[in-house]
Amino acid sequence: MLPIETISASDLDDYMNRPDAVIIDLRTPEEYEKSHIRTAVNIPYENVKACRQFSRKKILILYCERGSSSLFAARELTKMGYQVKSVVGGIRCYQGSNLFFSTEHSRIKTNQK
């Protein structure tokens, strides 16, 4: 099994403005619209393969509600050759840290059936 790199919610801000990183919210579009981390794009967990649109040179930073779905998605994307980091504790830990939040929308279109 490939090791999955994790980062803390407080370390997430270090990646927000990096041109080599993409922050991905794996929650549902409804959850994303209520609140999400600034600069994050929404690719629901069920559509994680839509991440193939990103260059393998990018670091994909994944978060979900509590951190478990992002670990599963990180494992899949790592197998596909991506550099991936999963946020421990998900958005719940990020909220608890009183860090940046946004209600701006930036959703990636996926081929949903």
Where are these regions (language model features)?
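Rhodanese-like catalytic fold shared by cysteine-dependent sulfurtransferases
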Residues: M1-V22, P29-I59, S68-K113
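Short, surface-exposed ligand- or partner-binding patches at beta-edge/loop junctions that are enriched
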Residues: Y63-C64
